[in-house]
């Protein structure tokens, strides 16, 4: 009866602070020891001892009943508390687990001190690795962002396939450096874009150009004189022909320059007179010369500035020029080339001329 009473007792699980390890051998040893002690007491004890043992068993039964009542009261209180708090339900379910299952679970986990030391070691070992991994991830993300930015800069997109390609104006600086700078090459000055020739309004000013380059007329006159001297000295016909052509071209150029100068002078005088008349109130609108009137005035001024001999030569030259021009415009029959009339029947190789 004593063994059954001991086995019927309720056993609670050890708390986590207890570091004793449960094993099946220890469990088997406890009832055997109790049995042996009971058997020893029963075999070697006397009759008075049996009375004492019965009294002890009676006391144990009463204590068990008291414990059962207390446990029932505790269970009733626990049920009321479970109704109030949901966490108590979890605790109640854990209390119903058998002691053997809890002991096996605790044995598989090992002592608490070892578990704590292992967890702390794992945290210490894992923390530097996590930091290194986080740094590697950040570096990779930064590299991807930079590569995406450089890719966008290198390959600009177009709005459509027909649009022109967008190209960056940035160019890398060359590694070549000029150690010795070459001397500056003297540049030729173009008189067309010379600031001395151009006016303040950036337009061509012929008066300023003539004043700035008046020495060229003297050079041309001296060149013409030298050509005439060479022409007089040379005896070769080919050289004489070339010199004659050069003299004619230079003289024509000088004559054209003088005519342009006369035209500018006549226009300046005419503008001055018209401005004076408008200022006096005799005219409201200025009169602009025609090209034909300008040519006539230029010709009159040319003949006025000539000597009598030069004037006669110029008039004779002009007369011949006009005669040749009229002869070209005249029909062939009136030129005096053919005195007789054209025959009625021409040969096969000749064409009949039409009489005007």
From Swiss-Prot:
InterPro entries linked: RRP36 (IPR009292)
Region entry Disordered, spans: 1-209, 302-356
Basic and acidic residues: bias regions: 130-156, 302-315, 323-338
Biased composition (Acidic residues): 16-40, 62-87
Major place of residence: nucleus
Location(s), subcellular: Nucleus, Nucleolus
Gene Ontology terms describing biological process: maturation of SSU-rRNA from tricistronic rRNA transcript (SSU-rRNA, 5.8S rRNA, LSU-rRNA)
Domain of life according to the entry: Eukaryota
Alphabetic keyword roster: Coiled coil, Nucleus, Ribonucleoprotein, Ribosome biogenesis, rRNA processing
Gene Ontology annotations for the cellular component aspect, listed alphabetically: 90S preribosome; nucleolus
Coiled-coil ranges (or none): 220-330
The family this protein is said to belong to: Belongs to the RRP36 family.
Quaternary structure (record): Associates with 90S and pre-40S pre-ribosomal particles.
Function: Component of the 90S pre-ribosome involved in the maturation of rRNAs. Required for early cleavages of the pre-RNAs in the 40S ribosomal subunit maturation pathway.
Cross-referenced PANTHER family: RIBOSOMAL RNA PROCESSING PROTEIN 36 HOMOLOG (PTHR21738:SF0)
This protein's name: rRNA biogenesis protein rrp36
Gene encoding the protein: rrp36
